[in-house]
Amino acid sequence: VNDAESDQRFTPRPRRAAARSHDRENLVEELQAIRRRVQMVSCTSRDSFHDGSDAYDVASMVIIRLAALFERPEFTSYLTAITREERLAIATTRNIAAHTGYKSMNDDLFWAAVTQRVPEILDRLIEESAGPEER
C-alpha cells in the first residue's frame, strides 16, 4: 500500500447529525461526572487535601479529564464558553499533575482551582452544551 492509498483508506467519513447529537450527550455526561468528582473534593477540608490523599487524587482526575475534553475534536463546537486563559491554566495544571509530579504543584492554588474555578467553568460548559430540551 502506497502513501496515497493509505491516506484514502484511513480518511474518516463526515460525521452524521445523529453522531453529533450523541457527542453532545457524551459531553454532558462527562461534564456531570467531572462535577461529581469536584463535589467529592469539596466535601473534604483544605487541611486534609495533600499529595497522597484520596481527595488530591480525585482532584487530579478532575483536571486530567477536563483537559482531555478540549483535545477531542468532536466536542470543539460545544466548548466555547471558556476563555483561552482558562484552557491554558487547565492544560498547565494537567501537565503538572500528569507529568512533572506533585512536588511542583502549589496545593493552595490546586485546591482553589478544583473547588472554585472548575465548578464555575463546568456550569458554563454544561449550560452551553445542554440541548434546547434541557434548558
Which residues does each predicted region cover?
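Solvent-exposed interaction patches of small proteins and small membrane subunits
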Residues: 1-135
